[in-house]
Amino acid sequence: KTKVIAITHLSNVTGAVLPIKEITQLAHSKGIIVVVDGCQGGPHLKLDMQDLDCDFYAISCHKMYGPTGLGVLYGKKKWLEQLPPYQGGGGMINEVKKDRISYGELPNKYEAGTMATAQVIAFDQSIKFLESIGIENIIKHEKELIEYGQEVLKKNNSVKLIGNPK
């Protein structure tokens, strides 16, 4: 009777990249909502939310050279419209009555209180910085570092490599 699964996209422990698209297809075939922890995936993988088809994907901005205290949550519109906010605050509520409350339109429905404007501007610059390098170049460089690290560590008999990140 599983309703929701939460999985990581890229493990910061083993380097394993989970097949999110395939996992999502299987989960959706059973009516299960898929939430992906993309904190490691965001800065290291080429992401296409339409292709992955997960219901939610969370990214931590500081993992992408952005400010701390800020994150991004991608959510499918059908879920964002359907689910209530987890907290309330100014700017997100349209109307309060004795017996009901109505929330603003997306994305305001989930923007409680004062937005962290400086952090959002800083994160925009982080994205531009990463885009100037190019995700393909980042992936290529990381692959070269992994191959070099594995080559050096395999020569050390005191080290046992676990996993095979790519």
Language-model segment annotations:
Residues 1-166:
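Pyridoxal 5′-phosphate
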